[in-house]
Amino acid sequence: MSIEIVPHAAAHVGAVAAFNSRLAAGGSPWSFYTDPLPDWIAPRPGQAVWREYHVAVDDAGDVRGAYALKPQTWLVHGEPRTVADWQGPFSEGSVDAKFTTLGLRMLRDMLKKYPLLYSWGHGGNEQPVVQMLLKMGWVMHQTPFCLLVLRPSRFLRLNALLRSSLLRRLALDLGAYSGVGFVLLKLHHAALRLRHACRFTATATEVPAFGPWADELWHRCKARYAAIAARDAASMNALVPAMGWPAGIRLKVDRRGQCIGWAVVLDTQMQGDARFGTLRVGSVVDCLADPDDTGEVVAVATQFLRRRGVDIVISNQAHPAWVRGFAQSGYAVLPNKRMFAPSPALRALLEPFDETARGLHLTNMDGHGPMAL
């Protein structure tokens, strides 16, 4: 049986639907996009970021695998490069041993299309895809997760991830209803804020789109990052559209009459989420500022979400200055919660890697975007 990897098109819609049905029947939790045109950042002429779908089709016309790519202009050491995130690969090999090697073939096909490939996510080194990447010579760069609990009692009672056993549920309920958990969490975040003892004076304004002010900020601060995806106004308006997903709230941050940064935040009421249960989750999914001004942006974004009544605020960050900015607002910084996995070619471009990694800016908007938020 021969298999060809081709761009997803209208002719493959039925075959993708059948592929998804076979995966579901085999017990796989995965599926692929039946619509060949991405809902989010569809390809458009002149756009610096887009998504594209590819399918693995056998000689009978059946789809046996698929993957998505998100190419985007990055600045690496000041030079523009096309760097791509990948989603998948999704293979029938997860339910049928005849296609076990198809996932590796699709990954190699991605690398042929975009050698500067990366993945931003993963839960741990034990995952099969991580083991495969390590064997192929990829590097796993660990990055932290930032968490601020604003409503401790609801956090203790509704956070699904922490309530994984009867004993844990009893302990968390006791902490919530006795008030002990409320006091301890409030004291913990207060102590983290006091450790930095910072005063911030910036203000935030909700705006409907990114304008010339965003371009001016981008050109002013882009050289302060060793590696960063393009965050000019056009790119950000494509990533955070006026309608559709993600429903980002754009905050322009000013200090003494000058724009010093911006943040994109989400306010999401979860329902049956595996991690957050039914919490109301605020998230800082993207942000930009001079590294010296990160604390100002985080502070006003946090205040904005606090006023909206969210239970917690979360963010994934890679750049040490942004991690410090979240810590200055009392966030708990939990290490080694998300991995940046650059291909060997991208890793070579990022050399000296350890030094460049300290200037790498990644947020939830990078990679697949703020999925599940």
State where each predicted segment sits:
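Non-catalytic N-terminal targeting/anchoring module and adjacent flexible stem/linker
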Residues: 1-18, 22, 309, 323-324, ...
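Short, well-ordered alpha-helical packing segments
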Residues: 67, 87-90, 103-111, 130-134, ...
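Conserved acetyl-CoA-binding loop-helix of GNAT-fold acetyltransferases
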Residues: 95-112, 292-304
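Low-complexity, charge- and small-residue-enriched intrinsically disordered regions
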Residues: 189-203
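Active-site/acyl-donor-binding loops of N-acyltransferases
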Residues: 35, 52, 71, 117-190, ...
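Short acidic, glycine/Ser/Thr-rich loop/turn "cap" segments at secondary-structure junctions
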Residues: 85-94, 112-118
